[in-house]
Amino acid sequence: MRIQVENLWVAFKNKVALREVYLDLFGDGAQVVALIGPSGAGKSTFLRLLKGMVKLSGGKVWVDSLPLHEGQRDALQQLRRRTAMVYQTFQLIGRLTVLENVLVGRLPHMSPIRGLFKHFSVQDLAKAEKLLEEVGLLEHAWQRADALSGGQQQRVGIARALIQEPALILADEPISALDPKNAKVIMELLLGAVRRQGIPLLVTLHHLEMVRHYADRVVAFKEGQVFFNGPLSDFTSEKEKELYFGEKETHEASEWFSSTLMV
């Protein structure tokens, strides 16, 4: 899996969300790349573009050699099969069971004429049950998804992404709606799964300590542009301060920043 971006622009009406973006990701052997930056910097837009949910306005993008900039329907269909998304707000279907929500991840691989849940294969069902066991929710398989806690729902989201057997997982702030204890559990589950299966992970995070603990590489966005792109060892505290507070740092900002490093 490799993501290549050349002079990417994305605009919505009169607002430019991404501009002059150049990136080459996962070609260096990194498995976990963290996207960071202030709110509204373009991180989520970039992820949704890679999932085929947002159209580019200019430039070129290749995902696993698929040319997204050409706008071909076949390329988009392949992209949706090869990429899986873990969302911030879980995106489960509350009236369906936990097992059925996991099976939703198999839909990109199914022909429309097969219908939905009546025609999943025995192999699909076995995979779903195995994944639910791995995330600690097998006993809840036939429970409605809307009866689960937030942390449990995100576990279902991870299982749904993994059953798709993707070449790339995109995670859009997967722990921002969780308390610190559940956030750590979810990150351990997600990172453990992708490392066992050798799946690259592109994840947006606001928890700086988790970036340091889990990421191999960091891409920082600021005002729609790439502010930093490189190994975690090169992303210094000075760069973090400049990213979030600019060149002129107030005393209050310095105290807040220092406190985040201690979390």
Curated annotation (Swiss-Prot):
Q: What is its main location?
A: membrane
State the Gene Ontology terms under molecular function: ABC-type phosphonate transporter activity; ATP binding; ATP hydrolysis activity
What does the record give as EC number?
7.3.2.2
The UniProt entry, under SUPFAM superfamilies, shows: P-loop containing nucleoside triphosphate hydrolases
Per the record, GO CC terms? plasma membrane
Q: Where is the ABC transporter domain?
A: 3-248
Q: Which UniProt keywords apply?
A: ATP-binding, Cell inner membrane, Cell membrane, Membrane, Nucleotide-binding, Phosphonate transport, Translocase, Transport
Reactions it catalyzes: phosphonate(out) + ATP + H2O = phosphonate(in) + ADP + phosphate + H(+)
- InterPro entries xref list: AAA+_ATPase, ABC_transporter-like_ATP-bd, ABC_transporter-like_CS, ABC_transpr_PhnC, MetN_ABC_transporter-like, P-loop_NTPase
State the compartments where it is located.
Answer: Cell inner membrane
Q: Got any disulfides in this one, which pairs? A: none
Q: Which residues bind ATP?
A: G37, P38, S39, G40, A41, G42, K43, S44
Q: How does it sit in the membrane?
A: Peripheral membrane protein
Q: Which family does it belong to?
A: Belongs to the ABC transporter superfamily. Phosphonates importer (TC 3.A.1.9.1) family.
What is known about what this protein does?
Answer: Part of the ABC transporter complex PhnCDE involved in phosphonates import. Responsible for energy coupling to the transport system.
Describe, as the record does, how this protein assembles with itself and its partners. Answer: The complex is composed of two ATP-binding proteins (PhnC), two transmembrane proteins (PhnE) and a solute-binding protein (PhnD).
Q: What is this protein called?
A: Phosphonates import ATP-binding protein PhnC 1
Q: Which organism is it from?
A: Synechococcus sp. (strain JA-2-3B'a(2-13))
Give me the gene this protein comes from.
Answer: phnC1
